[in-house]
């Protein structure tokens, strides 16, 4: 019996789940809206909402907890500089999950997970290094 056990396993090991949610949280903080499967979105929501609450607190211990949970320090800093002040007056409910139909390949239910009162300009922001032709010659 699994009384009191919350959370989905999502067919992954504990370390894989931890890394996946950390990376998805970074993507959500960076772009403020991502598309994923519905079960992943439902599991990601409390993970990120707790990080936003840390951003609202803003003290040193909260920063250290956020840096421990997120692998990229640049986007962890956005929690405290942008998102924390934005949601200072809101008592929870920083994220919404919208159903987005089914994926063609395997009919998996898809969802859009986004911040409430999100910044529209953050969507499609730079996603990291891009392969450029000619770099192989220099190496």
From Swiss-Prot:
PROSITE patterns: RIBOSOMAL_L17 (PS01167). SUPFAM superfamilies: Prokaryotic ribosomal protein L17. The keyword ATP-binding does not apply. Keywords: Ribonucleoprotein, Ribosomal protein. Residues 120-139 are annotated as: Disordered. GO terms for biological process: translation. It comes from the Bacteria. It holds the Pfam family Ribosomal_L17. One of its GO terms (cellular component) is cytosolic large ribosomal subunit. InterPro entries: Ribosomal_bL17, Ribosomal_bL17_CS, Ribosomal_bL17_sf. Part of the 50S ribosomal subunit. Contacts protein L32. Belongs to the bacterial ribosomal protein bL17 family. NCBIfam families: L17 (TIGR00059). PANTHER family: LARGE RIBOSOMAL SUBUNIT PROTEIN BL17M, RIBOSOMAL PROTEIN L17. This is Large ribosomal subunit protein bL17. The gene is rplQ.
């Amino acid at each position: 019996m699994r009384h009191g056990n919350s959370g989905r396993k999502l067919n992954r090991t504990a370390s894989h789940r931890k890394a996946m949610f950390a990376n998805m949280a970074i993507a959500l903080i960076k772009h403020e809206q991502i598309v994923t499967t519905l079960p992943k979105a439902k599991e990601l929501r409390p993970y990120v909402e707790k990080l936003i609450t840390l951003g609202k607190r803003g003290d040193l211990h909260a920063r250290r907890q956020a840096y421990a949970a997120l692998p990229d320090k640049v986007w962890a800093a956005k929690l405290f500089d942008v998102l924390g002040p934005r949601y200072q007056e809101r008592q929870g409910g920083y994220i919404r999950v919208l159903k987005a139909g089914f994926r063609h390949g395997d009919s998996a239910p898809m969802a859009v997970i986004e911040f409430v009162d999100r910044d529209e300009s953050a969507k499609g922001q730079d996603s990291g290094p891009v392969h450029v032709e000619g770099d192989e010659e220099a190496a």
